[in-house]
């Protein structure tokens, strides 16, 4: 079987999204910040919800797995208590 072609740096020719910077500029949270999510803080939670009302994934927000889990629980609890809506009205 013939091996795949590689670039001069040794990476596969097909490329890697992390290497070409496709995902690096979309991060929403700096790694230097201490992240705490309060279900009552509507402004902070809305930063992590897209225009359809979905929670933005980890690969875009730049959160760790633990922080993303805390965010998810806070958003779900805020929706349950009607702090933020389940469905966004602006999306039509």
Curated annotation (Swiss-Prot):
Coiled-coil region(s): none
Domain of life: Bacteria
GO-annotated biological processes: translation
GO molecular function, one term: structural constituent of ribosome
GO cellular component: cytosolic small ribosomal subunit
Gene3D superfamilies: Ribosomal protein S18
Keywords: Ribonucleoprotein, Ribosomal protein, RNA-binding, rRNA-binding
Record's function text: Binds as a heterodimer with protein bS6 to the central domain of the 16S rRNA, where it helps stabilize the platform of the 30S subunit.
The family this protein is said to belong to: Belongs to the bacterial ribosomal protein bS18 family.
HAMAP family: Ribosomal_bS18 (MF_00270)
Subunit structure: Part of the 30S ribosomal subunit. Forms a tight heterodimer with protein bS6.
NCBIfam families per the UniProt record, alphabetical: S18
Name listed for the protein in its UniProt record: Small ribosomal subunit protein bS18
Source lineage: Bacteria, Pseudomonadati, Chlorobiota, Chlorobiia, Chlorobiales
